[in-house]
Design a protein with these regions (language model features):
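Polar/acidic, low-complexity leader/linker segments enriched in S/T/G and N/D
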Residues: 1-40
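Oligomerization/assembly interface segments of phage tail-like spikes and tubes
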Residues: 39-41, 45-75, 125-139, 232-233
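Short amphipathic beta-strand/extended segments with alternating polar/hydrophobic composition
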Residues: 15-24, 106-113, 186-192, 215
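Short, acidic/charged, Gly/Pro-enriched secondary-structure junctions
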Residues: 65-112
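A short, compositionally biased
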Residues: 1-7, 88-94, 172-175
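Intrinsically disordered, low-complexity segments enriched in serine, threonine, and glycine
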Residues: 141-254
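Solvent-exposed loop and beta-edge segments used for protein-protein assembly and interaction
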Residues: 54-58, 87-91, 123-127, 161-163, ...
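Short beta-strand and beta-hairpin "edge-sheet" elements
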Residues: 30, 96-140
């Protein structure tokens, strides 16, 4: 759990207080909607539900306070706004946020619109502004989204949370590997250095000093792994590989 004072939050592990930004009002966060289509075929009573198994992203509006420590200084407003844009990575890419009211979780967000400033000038050194962000449907436990866990050649892994997990695996070494998680087996051939298996994005790739290369052709499988909620699965692997690691990504719905 991260220690945060009321109003504070983390953006990519940087505390908002370092940029003099606080959450003024706790936001309303709606539960993610199931991605479904309802059809009413001719001659059929009622409707049919087509469900693709996923959830929609949720839009959230944040009301924030920036306190620059200066009193009624119009010349500083441009600098303050630029610092705010930079802190939230405006228009660039997804960022990780941990709010004070949910310090065990990481929210994956992107800023969808430019901030709206409620006042055009500083009032006692402060500005109030609003942000509209889009949040992924799942929030992740802080100690399971970045840390690699070593996986022995034979053992059990329990998912203690109420949502299924789709981990990220990393295979280190050279050669071939057979690996089974639960009842699903994946076969890897010709591993050179490393291979990553992203079970959320359904993607197998190699990472060579930050250069990502598609490696789906090195994997044989009917499906990607997942670890069911509140259940244990057996994990076994064998082959010429030296190390297998996992970022478990325990998660809950928003």
């Amino acid at each position: 759990m991260v220690s945060l004072k009321p109003g504070e939050f983390l953006i990519n592990k940087v505390n908002s207080s370092t940029e003099k930004i606080l959450i003024q009002d706790r936001p309303d966060i709606e539960a993610p909607k199931r991605r479904q289509v309802h059809k009413e075929p001719a001659g059929y009573d009622g409707f049919l539900i087509y469900d693709d198994g996923g959830y929609e992203a949720t839009e959230v509006e944040l009301t924030l306070l920036y306190h620059g420590g200066r009193v009624d200084d119009p010349a500083a407003i441009s600098t303050a706004r630029n610092r705010i844009y930079k802190f939230f990575k405006f228009g660039q890419y997804e960022f990780k946020m941990t709010p004070y009211f949910d310090p065990e979780k990481v929210y994956l967000c992107i800023l969808t619109e430019a901030p709206t400033f409620e006042n055009k000038w500083y009032y006692n050194g402060a500005m109030v502004f609003k942000l509209k962000i889009k949040v992924q449907p799942y929030k992740y436990y802080v100690d399971t989204i970045d840390s690699w866990w070593n996986i022995p050649k034979a053992g059990w892994m329990r998912n203690p949370k109420m949502s299924d997990a789709k981990p990220l695996f990393r295979i280190i070494g050279n050669g071939d590997l057979d690996m089974t998680v639960g009842y699903k087996k994946m076969i890897f051939t010709g591993v050179e250095g490393n291979i990553y298996i992203d079970c959320e994005k359904y993607f197998v790739y190699r990472n060579n000093n930050g250069v990502i290369t598609n490696a789906n052709h090195k994997c044989k499988s009917k499906d990607f792994w997942h670890i069911p909620s509140e259940q244990s699965v057996q994990i076994n692997w064998n082959g010429a590989i030296s190390t297998v690691e996992m970022i478990p990504r325990w998660r809950d719905l928003l």
